[in-house]
Structure formats: C-alpha cells, structure tokens
Amino acid sequence: MKLYKINQGIIIEASEKFYLSNTKSWDAYINQDNLFEVISTDVQSLTEISWNYEGILAPIENQEIWASGVTYMRSREARMEESQDSGGADFYAKVYEAERPELFFKSTAARCVGTGEKVRIRKDSKWNVPEPELTLFITSSGKIVGYTIGNDMSSRDIEGENPLYLPQAKSYDKAAAIGPCLYVPKDVINPDTQISIEILRNGNLMFSGNISINRIKRKLADLAHYLFREMSFPNGAFLMTGTGIVPDNDFTLLSGDVVNITIEGIGTLSNEVE
C-alpha cells in the first residue's frame, strides 16, 4: 500500500484504488509501528475516490532526513576517486569495511522537495551529481515501516577537496528530494528490488543506470539501529541508505536537467535541476 501527502490530507492507494483518509495529521499517522495493519483497517471503512496523482507533496512533515554513505562498492570507488588528491581516499575504503556505518544529517522538511519540484546545485560547486537511494521511514521506536525514493544531491568537488567538507557538499537548500509516496508493504522490501535513474538534458538521455538493493553492503535494519542508538526522533525519521549508481567522473549536472529515479513498487521521483 502507498500513502500520498496532499494539501487536503492523506491519500491511500490500496489494490489500485484510492481513498482519502479521515486522519489529517501526517506525523501521527505514519509514526505507528503497525502502520500496515492500520491502513488495512482504515480502507475498509473509507469510500473510494477518483484521483489522478495531482498535488503530491513530499511525504514529510516534521521529520528529519539522515543519510548513509559508502554502502555500495560503486560509492566506495567514486568517493576514493574524488578524494585521491586530498589524501582522503583511505577514509572511504575503511568505512566501507568498518562495523560502524557512515551516517550524516541531510535535511529538514523545510529544505526538502517532493516529486515535480526543483532540486538545486550549489553555486560554489562545479561538479554535482544526483544520488538515487532507497529511503527508509523509521518510527520513533526505531521500526522500519515504510520506504520512499530519495535523491541525495551531492557536490563531488567539495567533498573530494576534503572529507570534512561533507556537510557542505551534502546539506543545502533543495539538496534532498523524496517521494512520490510512502510505500508501506506487509513485509520487508524485496531485496531484489531494482533502483534505476535517468538524467535528461533537453530531452536527450545523458546518463542512466540501475542496481538491485541486494548489492548493499549493510543490512537496512543495522543502519536504522545505528541512527537511533543515541538519538530520539519523536515523529520518526527518514534515512537514505546510500547509492550504488554514480555517473562517470566527466559528468556534472546542469541547470535544466531532469532527474528521474524509479524504484520498483514505489514509483518515480522526478525533479528538474534549478
């Protein structure tokens, strides 16, 4: 099942039918450990409506967005390449093998955008890429109950100059996009699920790639555990789980590019670059 956030409330998609939830609070509704069961019960008493996916907002209200780094081999390679001259390559090699994952703060809801909105590239950066990522929704008790698509916009030249510049390379206005919905399955997401991306420039395909989430180095539950180990999230939290798709080093995003990220079972997150 899927939940869509709109100005009028919450749209539930179940068995290819749509329902407008009686619940108005996004925070309260999604932050339930038994969310799948709650939705299943709710749709039994709701009236089916006609809806054509208009007015979709980012599926976030008062949550924070965090992110994981170097969780796929391709990400490890790319980080090592961009930081070779600064002497930081070893840090990425070590964190890929370490027990403790790399976690960093990505965005507040106010800085985040949803599908159909524009993401940004930093004005002081010349090498920027999108990073397509499966994104977890974790309740305040630490349970993974849903998934969405994340675009972790990144300034590779800034992070490559010095690993300590990562917060500037990763966190700025409109550097995070999530959506289009919160996917709430009965069981954990299928490990064979495919993530794919295409980048269009003036209608022409500039880059595409895909990867299965079973290629991730770490268990999703372990990433969630480390995030919640010493922090509380009263409304739950979103956690991007890292990327396994990185364009070649000669590619950078330009204003006007369109980034489409698709994850099987969830949908497509589409954003133009500002």
Segments and roles (model prediction):
Residues 1, 15-16, 26, 33, ...:
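Generic intrinsically disordered, low-complexity segments enriched for polar/acidic and small residues
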Residues 1-73, 270-274:
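Generic N-terminal segment detector
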Residues 7-8, 13-17, 138-143, 200-203, ...:
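Short acidic-glycine loop/turn motifs at beta-strand connectors
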Residues 7-8, 132-134, 257:
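Residue-level marker for the onset of beta-strands and adjacent loop->beta junctions
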Residues 18, 36, 91, 104-105, ...:
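Phenylalanine-focused residue identity feature
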Residues 38-201:
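Active-site microenvironments in enzyme catalytic cores
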Residues 156-274:
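Catalytic-pocket segment enriched in acidic/His residues
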